[in-house]
Design a protein with these regions (language model features):
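N-terminal glycine-rich FAD/FM-binding segment characteristic of electron-transfer flavoproteins
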Residues: 1-171
Length: 171
């Protein structure tokens, strides 16, 4: 199976699965998964499918067979565009999350989910999985636990204390 597959293998398998869907104009992916934060899988999918890719987008619009997106970096905001079909990945700034209604949850439970086997998408078992991965994780370190931060009791000087803290942090 797919257990232990690296990003290249995962991208390959997803590209093969997407290739079974006729007429796909747009593939939308996130930047992270539950087992990694590389953000490379959408670009790998696009490469295997031979499609343009716009990654790490915070804003997207589609008009006349063209997709335009904004990517924010430390250097500024960049506008990117490509013709459809395309693969994009979006970040957490793309929208305000909405929570489904109870009715929506119940309707979703009734929807059929298509499950494809590796054989059905044309992926051989020796092309994926931990034993066949092209990369190896040598070590990992858990994220440090979040601290509560510094608390300020405002007795008339709270604003000054916050400013002093921000200056000390070079913020």
């Amino acid at each position: 199976g797919m257990h232990g597959s690296d990003v290249i293998q995962t991208g390959w398998a997803l590209a093969r699965a997407l290739g079974t869907i006729e007429g796909t104009e747009l593939v939308i992916a996130g930047n992270e998964s539950t087992d990694g934060v590389g953000g490379a899988v959408p670009a790998i999918i696009a490469e295997y499918l031979g499609l343009p890719q716009l990654t790490h987008l915070r804003k997207v619009s589609i008009e006349g067979g063209k997709i335009t997106g904004e990517r924010e970096t430390d250097e500024g905001v960049f506008t990117l565009e490509a013709t459809l079909p395309a693969v994009i990945s979006v970040n957490e700034k793309i929208n305000e999350p909405r929570f489904p209604s109870f009715k929506g949850i119940m309707a979703a439970k009734k929807k059929e989910v298509t499950v494809l086997t590796l054989a059905e998408i044309g992926v051989e078992s020796d092309e994926v999985g931990l034993a066949n991965a092209g990369s190896t994780v040598l070590a990992s370190t858990p994220k440090p636990a979040k601290t509560a931060g510094e608390k300020v009791t405002d007795e008339g000087e709270g604003g000054n204390q916050i400013v002093q803290y921000l200056v000390a942090q070079k913020i």
